[in-house]
């Protein structure tokens, strides 16, 4: 602050006027005096009491370099100070030099026992109460010759001070002390200061003992409420140099912290920052003026509440402005660091000013400020968490989708979950570590729940895919082979079917079989479908695949072994035994007895297979699935625990078998009849004597051919061609070709003859037509019409 500014601040202002009105511009005066400096609690308030015209203002001006108005004794002795005035100074007169640094606010209180007030002691009492409530040191200004007097040495005023102090602090456990500094003016030294101190102390103790003390303060002593100090000042006019020296020595006690008799101990301070003192003083004076009981702690609490809330609001406003510029799209650690920095700046701003007020109020408002900050942070962090949640869900889904062809789902789920939770920890740990939010457990739980939901969904898809792949493999590798086994059945056909079924099923789940199981045969633990399932769910999936396999086998067998197909199987089996021998060469029947014997064997061979195909069994034991079929999983088990509601092994009923046998017998009977006819044809042949007659009668022709070279050559060509055709097995194509050629030739000849005949008849018809023919035509036409009408 400039010297001109300091000079203006040393000029006093009226804090409370003679009309008992508090100056509302006090805070502006403080700000003008302090400027941009942060004073905080580093200031002191000094008040002065004394009789009117006793030199109070003169003392303050000399000691603190203030500029209070003083009385001009050469003109008139009258009241100079009206009400209560206050001045600011940082220049205290000391023995070394003018001390600077500490801010002093000096209150010059209207003098007592003045003619202007007369018997009106109301303001005197209220001023004393105000000074006690706001000051650290209360200077009692008196002359040496007044010591020992009652009115002259302000004993009446001091009694008022004691009474007021008792009313303020008598019932309090933690009593607010104040220093009473007795300044003996015009001290000559003839009477030692110690003697004057003893006299004053005795008078004060006597006065204290006579006071009516409030409840709870009956046994209190004067020292519980006051500390006392005494000093003497030489005559200002007669001994100006000694007066100045005494004032400087007094100033040392206000500025030198190392002195044992340093006056401004921290126990006297009101504990209010300077920016709250004016509000506090105004509130106290309002209570005093309205004659209400003044409760200083309450007033201090009100001031603390008001000022800390104001400080907190300002800090939060600055915080909100900076926070609005913060981008929520920052990565988690950066966002947390930025939030932490804003929070620290806000709390630091509040702590710098708010911590100077009552601790309880300061902490309460600090907590409210932190709650408001946390609310802001919670909203922003919630937005960040929502974006992070969606991002991590997408990351998990993409991770699970990657390498699906070469990596099992369980590993992809594990990697995806670990990656997501690692990123979540990296993105959110700083929020908790920096105490921006208490915990992210709820967000982590929600994320885990979503991941588990997605994982369960992926497991469901993969389970369906595994089931579908196994089902497709089983159907593809089972259908044709099983149908082939059934269409060409052997006596152990069902054993072959089951062997093939077991082999196909084993291969369909081979990739999921656990290695190195040794002799372990428990199928509930033999397979791992790599879906990160518990043992029970893993086994349930295995049972589902096996159930589908049994269902496929059931459908193939029962759909193929219908009545018509079984009849065909029996016919083929009958024919293979009846028409062919053991070398698969067609039989040539010689007689009916041989046909009947072969028929009996072939029929038994076929009908025995009917019994085998009617019920699926191995070694005489019906085949029963070890799991329920897919279409009847909900059917109840029988007493043996077997799922036989669908009776897997029962293929043909008795009625169906009867129908099959009837169809088979018809076919077999036809085959027998045809075989017997073939035996009859083989016995009906040309007699040998016919060949002898042909040889005798055709001898000449035969010899003619042998003697003619042309016929010999033609015969050799024909024989050679016939041999070639026979060796190449071309008789059938040759016969087909000959038949086609004959047919074409026949058609061509017929067409030619038809053309010739039509050409011959046309001229005759054109030359003349007999009358009779027309008549016959007419008759025939009429007859046709009559027949049509009759019909």
UniProtKB/Swiss-Prot annotation:
PROSITE patterns: G_GB1_RHD3. Residues 40-268 form the GB1/RHD3-type G domain. It comes from the Eukaryota. One of its GO terms (biological process) is endoplasmic reticulum membrane fusion. Residues 707-709 are lumenal. Pfam families: RHD3_GTPase, Sey1_3HB. This is Protein SEY1.
